Amino acid sequence: MEGSSKGLRKGAWTTEEDSLLRQCINKYGEGKWHQVPVRAGLNRCRKSCRLRWLNYLKPSIKRGKLSSDEVDLLLRLHRLLGNRWSLIAGRLPGRTANDVKNYWNTHLSKKHEPCCKIKMKKRDITPIPTTPALKNNVYKPRPRSFTVNNDCNHLNAPPKVDVNPPCLGLNINNVCDNSIIYNKDKKKDQLVNNLIDGDNMWLEKFLEESQEVDILVPEATTTEKGDTLAFDVDQLWSLFDGETVKFD
């Protein structure tokens, strides 16, 4: 676009253009490539001037074939870096990226590429162990039927547990009645025992008092009416029944 619009020259450089570019850089130094075409009086773009200087006209550039040491270093660097020619040329002093690329494509690529291709083919041929595909069991949902089915309900119903299991050979009602009767009899016995104990205590006190009276009063003494102080035994036991005692 730049060459077509401004009529810039393209193609091979002449000796006159090389001398003008060399004089300009020696005078102003490297850099500011956008000003080089104007200062040198060249009808070239700045990119063309820069590449011409770095690849061909720079005084530190080495010309000729690469030495054996340089070829060995080029092979090792190419194994590490690949086709990064600018990085490889930076490690080969005096060699440009264009020179390194041209030398590789002309002398070394045909010797080393077949070996690389064979290695790549061997790598491709080696089978990769593959695990068999697992079968995914798909479970489809089944619609539920809400119709009443006696057979299904009978099968699916949970087992019934009897809260009050029947006793072996016994009737529950009879057992309950017997237990109630037993408790009533037991309460009656306790009540009678308590009454007897209380009556015995009362009787003991009564006998003690009667003995004291016998000591103080002789047995032969009688009342004014002639009655004795002795009590009837039947009247004494009638006290347990709650009846009143009448003295004769």
UniProtKB/Swiss-Prot annotation:
Keyword terms, alphabetized:
Activator, DNA-binding, Nucleus, Repeat, Transcription, Transcription regulation
Question: What GO CC annotations are associated with the protein?
Answer: nucleus
Give the signal peptide as a residue range, or say none if absent. none
Q: Which positions fall inside the HTH myb-type domain?
A: 5-57, 58-112
Subcellular location(s) per record: Nucleus
* SMART domains to which the protein is assigned, alphabetical: SANT
> What conditions trigger expression of this protein?
By jasmonic acid (JA), NaCl, sucrose, UV light, nitrogen deficiency and drought.
| Miscellaneous comment | This protein has reduced anthocyanins induction activity in cv C24 and cv cvi-1 backgrounds.
Question: Which PANTHER family does the record cross-reference, listed alphabetically?
Answer: TRANSCRIPTION FACTOR MYB113-RELATED, TRANSCRIPTION FACTOR MYB8-RELATED-RELATED
The protein in question is named: Transcription factor MYB75
Q: Which gene encodes it?
A: MYB75
